[in-house]
């Protein structure tokens, strides 16, 4: 967690993308959301994907450890916000969006009121193997039954490059979510040709995948 804060303080945020993620645009309808419903974006940073969701009349709840990221999101998008304290979080709130500044693992279900979907572009792959299992367990505990998750992952030979982002295979996704979620692979491709950083490190492949998961009743 200290490293995450440090990266924002020193602007080492190579994972941040200025453009809206094309997979979110393509698969947005898979959430089956209607106007005014709410989506949760864990470890949200200052992603412009949240602005895209707002423009689709979808409400957003996010959680982020760094207040720098949250403040930059609002300032760069010229959005005013109100600041308050809610439990262990500083809550930054504007029209249609609530961003909790604090630890994801401190979130409870009441913080995610009316959330119908989860968008995980770079949360699971930002965590090491030990934390990934804890992350999925906690996420499952705090979201409602039938909530859908759009999950984006990377997979590559982990011994050829240290994370983050960490390698997460389809097998691991199945193991992590097995029993609590139905899941479907929507997309999977080896995209090493478009990853010069991985090429320079001698990585053999970079598999990018998109999954749709739905929490089921036990």
Locate each region found by the language model.
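Class I (Rossmann-like) S-adenosyl-L-methionine-dependent methyltransferase catalytic domain
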Residues: 1-35, 46-49, 62-97, 101-111, ...
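Short amphipathic alpha-helical interaction patches enriched in hydrophobic/aromatic residues
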Residues: 12, 122-123
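Conserved acidic residues
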Residues: 37, 115-116
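Class I SAM-dependent methyltransferase "Motif I" SAM/SAH-binding loop
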Residues: 40-45, 123
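Gly/Ala-rich phosphate-binding loop of Rossmann-like dinucleotide-binding domains
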Residues: 54-55
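A conserved beta-strand element that flanks and buttresses the S-adenosyl-L-methionine
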Residues: 119
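A short, conserved alpha-helix within the catalytic core of class I
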Residues: 126-138
């Amino acid at each position: 967690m200290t490293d995450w804060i440090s990266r924002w303080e020193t602007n080492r945020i190579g994972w941040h993308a200025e453009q809206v993620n094309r997979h979110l645009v393509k698969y947005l309808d898979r959430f089956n959301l209607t106007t005014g419903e709410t989506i949760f974006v864990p470890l949200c940073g200052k992603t412009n994907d949240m602005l895209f969701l707002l423009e689709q009349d979808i409400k957003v709840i996010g959680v982020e450890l760094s207040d720098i990221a949250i403040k930059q999101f609002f300032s760069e998008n010229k959005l005013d916000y109100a600041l308050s304290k809610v439990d262990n979080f500083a809550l930054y709130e504007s029209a249609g969006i609530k961003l909790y500044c604090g630890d994801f693992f401190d979130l409870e279900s009441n913080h995610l009121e009316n959330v119908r979907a989860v968008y995980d572009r770079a949360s699971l792959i930002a965590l090491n193997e030990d934390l990934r299992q804890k992350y999925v367990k906690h996420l499952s505990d705090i979201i409602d039954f039938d909530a859908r998750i759009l999950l984006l992952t990377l997979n590559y030979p982990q011994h050829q490059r240290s994370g983050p982002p960490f390698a997460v295979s389809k097998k691991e996704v199945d193991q992590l979510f097995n029993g609590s979620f139905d899941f479907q692979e929507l997309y999977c491709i080896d995209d090493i040709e478009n990853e010069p950083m991985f090429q320079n490190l001698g990585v053999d492949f970079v598999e990018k995948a998109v999954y749709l998961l739905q929490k089921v009743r036990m």
